[in-house]
Amino acid sequence: MLSILYFFLGTSLGSFIGLICDRFPEKSIIFPRSHCNQCGHPLRFFEMIPILSQLFLRFKCRLCQSSIPYRYLFLELFCGGILLLYFYNYLDFGRTYLLFFSLCLTIFDLKNKSYPLLIWILGTLPLLCLGNHYLTFSLGISLAVLSYIKRLNIGEGDFLYLASVSLIFPFSKILIAIELACSFGLMYFLVRKNPNETVAFVPF
């Protein structure tokens, strides 16, 4: 029973992350209340139940019948799965939080090829309390500043994200993550349809 509660909490967090990524920074994440993006219909409580409401409504708005993107369902399922892993002790609290934070930045990066600095600051503050690799964190911040000044090929946001990750993971694992990200990024670079498209690094 408790595992179901954790899963439902995770799906709710996933729904909230989706709302943040849809609205911020152009709109308030508090007002107006959740609504259909097409017709503006304010959602009733039974239309905001994660996963179940989408299945019940068959991925369509109750009023205008416009389609609800499947990405919201996948996001809620993924976040529910993360909290289940935490519940069964496959993840500690720090890595669980980092996964949610990374997911939020990933969505922003995929949409805009960047993410709001305020989101990074607010998301990193708890990691400063949870982590202890402050030297590596300082190195990441320094590289971000250098990237901003010199306009390097790797954006400052990528270095800021690596700085956040370094608070939870040691430097050796950060290097492995960079190697894997560069490999996957290169593969995507080679097969992409638009040769002038900027590649978002955080998702990798």
Task: Name these PLM-found stretches.
Residues 1-204:
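A membrane-topology feature that recognizes alpha-helical transmembrane segments
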